């Protein structure tokens, strides 16, 4: 097991020692970390050894080049995503390229991480006397947020990653259950999960937790899939009692084609309705972008003036799209999946390019 967790001193040290190839603006301070404005994702690809090797090498090359935020999930490639991160961490740490304390490692739980899905869930959890989990706890055949399930999945993620502490642990797309269970039941389930995660933070298994969503924070309050961020934060505060809660992160898609988190008012905070990222900032919650380049789809459809303004000599539209997302005001980091060495090298070129400032960004989308 790799001991330790991301620390303020060591993540700042990571940023400082990469200043020869990276601009200081490539890094941001949030939640007692200094982390890169680009994070490496591990979502796409088949669950085989060839992809494992590519993902492992992509992580190693990214960390060597100035990216110290790594994002995965237990269901990514049926647990191979996390196991590829472990292989990369072992190589990086054994070679003394980096220390564990310099890296911000994030994972998620909630989806079924096995090909057999319902059969596996029934065998491992419903028919297992170790757990008090019912068939009704599995929603849409793919998702469970029963506290015992999440606790067990967190333990499995720690084993897959080979680490003592996950820096940020997300409940993965809980809005999957909305529209199937009632809103009251949903927030009740959320409260039970948060109780488990607060205890996990107390035990040093995680540093912070959050919710990773696809729709939840971007859709309007009238939508069945809407998650109320203020209410969610209040639940965490209630569970934490007098001490500060550890619900400190959200993850949501942000890219040139999906701007709702930036421009669409969907979240009420202190009587005002705000876009999700603005609301998160006001509530003291850090926002991370997923799908930062929309998996490079449909980039040709965007106005040439936007792509030109983002270009700054960037060679490819996908780089311009990533530059756009990591420049969103109030956003901590933009995730991008990487496997090919060429894509890693291309994305690393952005670490020597400053993000747009708030005024430039506002002019771009205005």
Regions found by a protein language model. Give the residues of each.
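Hydrophobic residues in well-ordered beta-strands that form the structural core
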Residues: 71-72, 107, 211, 289
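Glycine-centered flexible beta-alpha turn that most often forms the glycine-rich phosphate-binding loop
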Residues: 40, 70, 166, 209
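N-terminal small/glycine-rich loop or linker at the start of catalytic domains
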Residues: 29-48, 107-141, 170-178, 294-301
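Active-site mouth loops of central-metabolism enzymes
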Residues: 41-54, 134-151, 179-186, 305-315
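Structural motif
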Residues: 61, 65, 161, 328-329
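Beta/alpha (TIM)-barrel catalytic core signal, keyed to glycine-rich beta->alpha loops juxtaposed to Asp/Glu
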Residues: 2-26, 59, 78, 88, ...
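Catalytic domains of carbohydrate-active enzymes, especially glycoside hydrolases
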Residues: 57-78
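Glycine-rich loop at the start of a catalytic domain that most often binds anionic cofactors/ligands
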Residues: 79-95
């Amino acid at each position: 097991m790799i001991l330790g967790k991301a620390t303020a001193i060591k993540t700042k040290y990571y940023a400082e020692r990469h200043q020869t190839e990276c601009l200081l603006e490539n890094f941001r301070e949030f939640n007692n970390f200094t982390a890169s404005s680009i994070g490496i994702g591990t979502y796409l690809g088949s669950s085989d050894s060839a992809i494992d090797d590519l993902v492992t090498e992509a992580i190693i090359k990214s960390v060597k080049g100035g990216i110290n935020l790594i994002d995965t999930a237990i269901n990514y490639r049926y647990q191979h995503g996390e196991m590829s991160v472990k292989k990369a961490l072992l190589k990086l740490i054994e070679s003394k390229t980096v220390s564990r304390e310099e890296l911000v490692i994030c994972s998620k739980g909630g989806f079924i991480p096995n090909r057999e899905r319902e059969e596996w869930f029934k065998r491992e959890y419903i028919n297992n006397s170790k757990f008090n989990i019912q068939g009704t706890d599995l929603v849409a055949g793919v998702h469970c947020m029963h506290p015992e399930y999440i606790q067990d999945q967190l333990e499995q993620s720690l084993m897959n990653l080979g680490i003592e502490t996950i820096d940020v642990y997300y409940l993965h797309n809980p809005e999957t259950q909305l529209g199937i269970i009632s809103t009251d039941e949903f927030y009740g389930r959320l409260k039970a999960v948060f109780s488990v995660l607060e205890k996990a933070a107390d035990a040093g298994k995680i540093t912070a937790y959050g919710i990773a969503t696809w729709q939840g924070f971007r859709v309007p309050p009238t939508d069945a899939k809407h998650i109320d961020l203020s209410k969610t934060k209040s639940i965490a505060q209630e569970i934490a009692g007098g001490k500060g809660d550890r619900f400190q992160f959200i993850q949501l898609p942000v890219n040139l084609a999906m701007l709702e988190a930036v421009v669409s008012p969907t979240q009420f905070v202190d009587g005002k309705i705000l876009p999700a990222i603005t609301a998160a900032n006001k509530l003291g919650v850090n926002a991370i972008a997923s799908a930062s380049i929309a998996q490079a789809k449909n980039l040709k459809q965007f106005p040439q003036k936007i792509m030109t303004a983002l270009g700054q000599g960037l060679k490819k539209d996908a780089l311009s799209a990533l530059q756009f997302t990591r420049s969103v005001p109030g956003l901590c980091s933009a995730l991008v999946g990487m496997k090919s060495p060429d894509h890693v090298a291309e994305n690393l070129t952005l670490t020597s390019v400053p993000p747009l400032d708030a005024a430039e960004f506002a002019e771009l989308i205005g």
